[in-house]
């Protein structure tokens, strides 16, 4: 989960980046900022209702990101109104603005032992970090939050490798963590 206190993940910062990329209009940005709190409450209630034993240990503002809001609202793109703003495009645009590489993860290119043997499932899920590959002596790690330096340092300590984060969508990282670690535990 991206650190929502990080200004780079604020609704204003994200709108500014999407505006600069011509993916949303000024009117859309204003409308999104007005709807943000209400939509976060809706998504928070949905999240809680999906849990068997809901534990209310956070506020909607801290558990639901602005990107979640954008995806829920299914925004039309300003540059191509026939298309919707999707998660891949949002994260790719943010990665470009942050000057961090973006990578669409191909699960067929991942090695089970590297993914599941580098960090624990609980750590991977908590920080949304997915080890992808070792390139030029560096561990490439996919994450929707390339600025979680503390978690990245922890992975460096455990793996004894320099870690290079790449941006990937939150849903891809979550899905592949569940699939790879689930498969790993099913065969052991």
Protein language model annotation of sequence segments:
Residues 174-188:
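Short, low-order "capping/linker" segments at domain edges
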Residues 1-152, 158-162, 167, 171:
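Non-catalytic accessory regions
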């Amino acid at each position: 989960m991206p650190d929502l206190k990080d200004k780079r993940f604020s609704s204003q910062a994200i709108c500014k980046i999407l505006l600069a990329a011509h993916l949303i209009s000024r009117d859309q940005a204003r409308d999104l900022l007005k709807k943000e709190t209400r939509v976060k409450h809706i998504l928070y209630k949905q999240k809680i209702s999906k849990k068997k034993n809901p534990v209310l240990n956070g506020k909607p503002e801290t558990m639901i990101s602005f990107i979640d809001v954008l995806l829920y609202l299914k925004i039309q793109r300003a540059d191509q109104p026939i298309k919707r703003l999707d998660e891949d495009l949002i994260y790719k645009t943010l990665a470009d603005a942050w000057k961090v590489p973006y990578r669409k993860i191909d699960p067929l290119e991942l090695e089970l032992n590297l993914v599941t043997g580098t960090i624990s499932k609980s750590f991977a899920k908590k920080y949304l970090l997915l080890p992808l590959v070792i390139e030029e002596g560096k561990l490439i790690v996919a994450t929707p939050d390339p600025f979680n330096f503390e978690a990245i340092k922890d992975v460096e300590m455990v793996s004894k490798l320099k870690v290079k984060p790449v941006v990937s969508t939150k849903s891809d990282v979550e899905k592949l963590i569940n699939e790879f670690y689930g498969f790993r535990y099913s065969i052991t």
